[in-house]
Amino acid sequence: MKILFCTDGSKISFNALKNIAYWIKQATIDTICVIDWNILPAEITIDEENFSFSCANVADTILDYAEEEIKNLGLQLGNRIKNCGSAIESILEQSEKEKYDLILMGSHGKKGIQKWLGSVSQEIINSSKISDYIAKKENNKKKVLFTTDGTECSLSVIGEIIS
């Protein structure tokens, strides 16, 4: 099973990883961090080269932390992916390009302003062609209620998780 773990460094994104770790020991987890500059007002001009460099540094710090968390949870570490730009577009493009089985993310990120502009996780749920796991808070329960639309994809993910 291939999982795309999406993180902006927020505690909630790492809660998603912790919540599902018990169920995905055999999965390979690729981690994507997208620094989304689309929230900047159009009136603000930036030096794109320096801003891209800063974005890359922030993404590297977040990805380093994510790698440690994945290792500490005893999970199989995959690739690191970093992008600057639209989080929604980057996540959807990556999930389709690499044919992941599951997108894993927190319900909302670090930026409170994004709640006003629209939720990345909500758009991923609505637009993704694969299964998604969205977490709100850490939960150490060993019971999970899976909902499915009956598609082969949904059933295969459940099969992978319970095997």
Q: What residues fall within each predicted segment?
A:
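Short glycine/proline-enriched coil/turn segments at helix->beta-strand junctions
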Residues: 1, 23-28, 74-76, 98-99, ...
